Amino acid sequence: MKNTVKLEQFVALKEKDLQKIKGGEMRLSKFFRDFILQRKK
């Protein structure tokens, strides 16, 4: 469970960066979608 909390904090930080970085938005959003789908399994 500790890992889950750390991952959620990491994702939250990356989402803030994502808003700043428009160029890599498509690539990062795809990465997050795949990442979240993997966690649900």
UniProtKB/Swiss-Prot annotation:
Query: Primary place of residence?
Result: secreted
GO BP of this protein: establishment of competence for transformation
Q: Which InterPro entries match?
A: Competence_ComC
Q: Which GO terms describe its cellular component?
A: extracellular region
Subcellular location per UniProt equals: Secreted
- Which positions are listed as propeptide? 1-24
Q: What keywords is this UniProt entry annotated with?
A: Competence, Pheromone, Secreted
* Gene Ontology molecular function: pheromone activity
The record's NCBIfam families line, in alphabetical order, gives: ComC_Streptocco
Q: Which family does it belong to?
A: Belongs to the ComC family.
Function, in words: Acts as a pheromone, induces cells to develop competence for genetic transformation.
Q: What is this protein called?
A: Competence-stimulating peptide type 1
**The organism of origin for this protein:** Streptococcus pneumoniae
